[in-house]
Amino acid sequence: TTRFQISGILSTTEKNPSGPPPHQETARTARYIAHSSDWGHLATISTQDKVRHRLPFGNIFSVSDGPQDNGTGVIYFYVTPMDYTVSDLKSNPYASLTFSEAEGEFCRQMVYDPEDPRCARLTLTGKMVEVASEELGFAKQAMFSRHPVMAKWPVGHKWFFMKMELIQVWLQDWIGGVSLIPLEDYFKATPF
């Protein structure tokens, strides 16, 4: 299965099963990007005086949708109330999280600029909520298996787990427009 072929250059073939899926498989591509990404750009509406109240504000967060062998599509965060973005979320819990396939090797190998539509980007929009106690074990495993240093961060910063309850999945992975992926299709797809 080849993702695509341009100018005789092949990207991902059956010989490289860890590469991205074919671009036509939009739900699977979205899950692949969400699972492969270690960090993303979270955009909120700012409540901070230093950032002109009510303007968009973005911040980088380490994320995980589960351990390497168990991607769920649900994005988990480990955050502190000391972070401006977390303060923003208390006022307005809706946010957008953007990932770029440029984080991995694929776009570099294909010599795609991060803005090239063939270098896929995924934006998940939803409501940020604190992880409930019955889900804390999995959230911890998801985050600390992918970001082990986080488990040693200062307790005094009052770290806690959040997740994004998805409302919309937006994917651009090819020339000619974007795909809005139904949530059911997104969660049904596998990132592997």
Language model: regions and residue ranges:
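Binding-site signature for planar aromatic cofactors or substrates
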Residues: 1-192
